[in-house]
Each structure stands twice: as structure tokens, then as C-alpha cells.
């Protein structure tokens, strides 16, 4: 008999208020400049992707596979438009945050290309992409980042 192992779903956990200060250095690295750059890229990508976004509070999430993402606190859906691939659609704030975080990680990896720091961020990109493939809005997320 063959034992078939079914992979466990990747679980997202919202970071508690008391743990928020450790989030950015844990996932973007200990450099203050990189932490600020990473956070600013996520916010910036959301601003480029969503005309209705004008800042606000963000939730931080850790993933059981070692990844992470950030998502704006917002009730309802957000209109996301990606000029580079023609995607236009409405996503939950959670899915929109995943898209913005993936774009930000991609850009930060390109900026740090050829360094060990880039390798860690590339892994985090792939961890988040794996989670996105299990998300309820996976099809829309992947169309947005295509």
C-alpha cells in the first residue's frame, strides 16, 4: 500500500498588535533602510494599483510556510488595475494586499539582485505565491500578477 501525503494548507495568521514591531525586520531584514523601503514599496504598489487607495492602517500576516504579506484595513472590495498586463477587477482587501506585497517583493528582489539578501526575499516571494494559489481569490490574484 502506498502512503499518499496530502500537503497541509498554508495558514495565514494576523500579527498581534504587540508583535508588529518585529514584523518588518523579520521579513524584510534587519536593515532599517530595507525595512522602510520594503514597507514603502508595498504602500506604493497599492497606490499604483488602486486609484481609491489613499493610505490607512495595514494588517500584517505571517504564513505557516515562512512567508508573509501586508493588507490594508478596508471593508468591501477594491478596484485593482494593472497597467502592465491589462488586469482590471475587484479584489478583497486581503487579496489586494497579497498582490501589492508580491509586486513589492519582486521589485525589491530586482533592486538587491545578486546578493544574499535577495535570495531570502525571493524565497519569501515564492512562499507568498504558494499561499496565493490556495487563496479563495487565487485566479484573480494570478491574473493581476501575470
UniProtKB/Swiss-Prot annotation:
Family (UniProt): Belongs to the antirestriction protein family.
Stated induction or repression of this protein's expression: Expression is decreased in the presence of KorA and KorC.
This protein's record includes keyword Zinc-finger: no
Keyword annotations from UniProtKB, A to Z: Plasmid
Cited Pfam families: Antirestrict
Natural source organism: Escherichia coli
Protein name: Antirestriction protein KlcA
Keyword Lyase attached: no
Amino acid at each position: 500500500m502506498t502512503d499518499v501525503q496530502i500537503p497541509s494548507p498554508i495558514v495565514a495568521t494576523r500579527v498581534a498588535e504587540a508583535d508588529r514591531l518585529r514584523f518588518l525586520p523579520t521579513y524584510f531584514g534587519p536593515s532599517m533602510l530595507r525595512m522602510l523601503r520594503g514597507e514603502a514599496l508595498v504602500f506604493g504598489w497599492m497606490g499604483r494599483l488602486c486609484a481609491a487607495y489613499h493610505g490607512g492602517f495595514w494588517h500584517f500576516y505571517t504564513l505557516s510556510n515562512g512567508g508573509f504579506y501586508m493588507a490594508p484595513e478596508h471593508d468591501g472590495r477594491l478596484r485593482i488595475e494593472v497597467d502592465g498586463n491589462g488586469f482590471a477587477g475587484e479584489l478583497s482587501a486581503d487579496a489586494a494586499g497579497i498582490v501589492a506585497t508580491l509586486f513589492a517583493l519582486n521589485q525589491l528582489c530586482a533592486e538587491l539582485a545578486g546578493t544574499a539578501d535577495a535570495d531570502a526575499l525571493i524565497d519569501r516571494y515564492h512562499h507568498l505565491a504558494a499561499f496565493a494559489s490556495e487563496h479563495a481569490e487565487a485566479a484573480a490574484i494570478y491574473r493581476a500578477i501575470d
